[in-house]
C-alpha cells in the first residue's frame, strides 16, 4: 500500500475550503465540469453533486447534466470556485441543445484536422 506524499495531502486539504460550493473543474482531456463539491480525499478525488459538463464551441454552449459525478484526482488540471452572484457567461453566448453542440464540435474538429493536414502539405515553403 502506498501512502500519499505530504504535497498531495496539503493540496487536498485546501479543497476543504470549497466544500458545499459551486466549482469549475477543468480536466486533462479539456472538459469543463461544474457542480457542488460534496466530498474529496487525500488524492484530490472529488464528488460533485448536480454536476454538468459545459461544452463551448465558438459563441454556442450547452450544459449537459451529469448528476452525481466522481472525478479522479489525477485528471484534474484546475479547480476554482464560481461566483454564484456573477453572470457565468458573456451576453453574446447562445445556449443550444446537446445535439446541435455535438454537431458543432464535430465540425470544429474536422476543421482543425484539415488545417493540420494543410500545414503539413505546405511545410516545404518554410514560412516561419
Swiss-Prot record:
This is Sm-like protein LSM1A. InterPro entries: Lsm1 (IPR034104), LSM_dom_sf (IPR010920), PTHR15588 (IPR044642), Sm (IPR047575), Sm_dom_euk/arc (IPR001163). Component of the cytoplasmic LSM1-LSM7 complex which is involved in mRNA degradation by promoting decapping and leading to accurate 5'-3' mRNA decay. LSM1A and LSM1B are essential for the formation of the cytoplasmic LSM1-LSM7 complex which regulates developmental gene expression by the decapping of specific development-related transcripts. Required for P-body formation during heat stress. Belongs to the snRNP Sm proteins family. Its main location: cytoplasm. The keyword Glycosyltransferase does not apply. SUPFAM superfamilies: Sm-like ribonucleoproteins. One of its GO terms (molecular function) is RNA binding. Disruption phenotype: No visible phenotype under normal growth conditions, but the double mutants lsm1a and lsm1b show severe developmental alterations, such as delayed seed germination, reduced root length, epinastic, chlorotic and small cotyledons, small and serrated leaves, abnormal venation in cotyledons and leaves, dwarf plants with early flowering, short siliques with reduced seed number and small morphologically alterated seeds. It comes from Arabidopsis thaliana. It is found in: Cytoplasm; Cytoplasm, P-body. It comes from the Eukaryota.
Amino acid at each position: 500500500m502506498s501512502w500519499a506524499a505530504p504535497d498531495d495531502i496539503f493540496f487536498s486539504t485546501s479543497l476543504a475550503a470549497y466544500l458545499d460550493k459551486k466549482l469549475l473543474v477543468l480536466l486533462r482531456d479539456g472538459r469543463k465540469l461544474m457542480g457542488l463539491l460534496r466530498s474529496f480525499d487525500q488524492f484530490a478525488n472529488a464528488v460533485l453533486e448536480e454536476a454538468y459538463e459545459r461544452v463551448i464551441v465558438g459563441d454556442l454552449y450547452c450544459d449537459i447534466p451529469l448528476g452525481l459525478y466522481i472525478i479522479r484526482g489525477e485528471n484534474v488540471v484546475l479547480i476554482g470556485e464560481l461566483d454564484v452572484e456573477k453572470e457565468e457567461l458573456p451576453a453574446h453566448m447562445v445556449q443550444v441543445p446537446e445535439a446541435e453542440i455535438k454537431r458543432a464540435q464535430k465540425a470544429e474538429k474536422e476543421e482543425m484536422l484539415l488545417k493540420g493536414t494543410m500545414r503539413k502539405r505546405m511545410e516545404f515553403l518554410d514560412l516561419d
